[in-house]
Amino acid sequence: MEKDEKYILAYEEYKKAYFKESENFDLWKNYYFFLWYIMAEDTALKLTNFIKQNSIETLLPSIASDGIKKYKLNPEALFILGYTVSLFPYFFGEYLEWEEKGKSFLESAYNLSSSDKIYKLAYLGSIYNQENKDEYDEICLQAANEVKSRFSGNGLLNSYFSEVLYRIDRASQ
């Protein structure tokens, strides 16, 4: 449904499934990301009224909070939370507080799984500066194949991360 841009139908299916299986990590991460994505792209997707009518702006932080509680030691959850929260901290609360939380989630994901190139890429990107530029550029190159492999599946989460984390062009410039 996501692939066919049937977002309202996808929302209804996610909502029903999450009500039945709120402990399912794969369901949580896809539902959470779906909610974040439609909030981030509401104007482009022409979903502004739908988001307001269904209180997505309060549902998203609630589902995020579920994930933070249940998966606080899961590097994949921390990566997804960190990346999304860092981009739009105001979706979750006070901007500076949540911006720092986003960076902290990315750092925790990397610390829990320091050999994971994608988590390292996201973490270094969150603290990017001239001092870590070379290391960041190098991890962009090293992570490229893993990005394409890990995010090769269906759904918004996979297509989004496959596109935004494949940074080989940026690193080679």
Where are these regions (language model features)?
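Alpha-helical repeat scaffolds
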Residues: L9-K16, L45-K70, Y95-A109, K133-R150
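N-terminal alpha-helical scaffold/docking segments in eukaryotic complex subunits
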Residues: M1-K20, L27
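Intrinsically disordered, low-complexity, charge-biased linker/tail regions
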Residues: F50, E138-Q173
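Amphipathic alpha-helical repeat scaffolds of TPR domains
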Residues: E21-K46, K72-F91, S115-E131, N154-R170
